[in-house]
Each structure stands twice: as C-alpha cells, then as structure tokens.
Amino acid sequence: MKEFSLDTSYLYGHACHTIDQVLSFFGRPDHIHYDVRQLLGTNRMNDYFDLDLYYGSTKVSVKSSYFRIKERPSFVVYGKKGMFVKATKDRQEEDLKKFYLPNHPDFGLDLPEHYGVLTYVDENGVYHEEKVVSEVGDYSRVYQALHDSIVLGKEKLIQDQETILQIEILEEGIRQMKEKIGRAHV
C-alpha cells in the first residue's frame, strides 16, 4: 500500500474478525488499550495492531502484524493452572479458498493436527496435555439469519449495537494512531 486508506487498513481488514468474536463471547469491554502503528511510515497502511480489551480482571488481546515470519496462534488462553492454544484458523475459509464448498460433509472440519491443545496441572499436581476437538463452525448460519431478517422479518442474529460497537472500536484505533503520529511531528 502506497498510502493510508480505511478500506485497505490492516486494522479494519484483519482485526474486525477477531474483535467480532471477542464481542460475541464477552460483550462490551470495560476499557480498551490501543496500539496501532504504521511501521512502513506515515500515511502508509497501518501494518501492526495490538488491542487489549479488559473485562474486569480478564484481558483479551487482539494483535497481528503484516510483518511476521510465522503466523500467531489463533487463540491462546491462560488460566491459573494451565493454558489452551489453538494454532490454526477455522478451516471454512481455507476450504472456500480451495473451492471446496459447504455441500461436502467434511467442509470446514478440523483434522486432529488442527485441534487445540489444553495443557494444565490437575488438583493432584499432575501435568496433562491433551488435544481438544474443535467446535464445528458454520458461516452459512450468519447468511441465513441475515436473509431471514431481511426477507422474513425475523429478529437479527447480530444486533445493530454489536456492529456499531465494532466499528467504534476500529475507528478509535485509527484515531489514536493518527493522534500519535500528529504528536510525533509537533
């Protein structure tokens, strides 16, 4: 990208998916810390973001960089006695990119090598590491619900305030990035 544009923004194009998931699981955060950068320089695309969404004592981080040699895990969850790591993304997108369509019974299904890994110490102090079978995703439910809302007048699956909150979060990230750049040039 030669110059910054919202419609090609790395934050808008990539963080939006994960922020959507976080908001659907946790709701409106109490507080958000934004770190959105243009590593290629001013007026170029924002190519790095690190957003920390706080929910009481829980912190959810959404981060990525255009400049990474390896992909980050999709999810890492830390607890007091263990952690869960899901390294790979939902298979639906990968299947669609290969024109492997939803009419196949195994569309979007993770193979064992894609499962998350739960590592923990139990109440007896014994270490465990086990694979966790992935939930089956289904993008088509969202599109069907959108159709049913528009055509049949059914209640929306995704409420307006959820979409507005996501846009507000993305816009605030861009605003803070631009504000930081403005202070650097004063």
Language-model-derived ranges and their functions:
Residues 130-185:
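C-terminal helix-rich "cap/oligomerization" subdomain common to oxidoreductases
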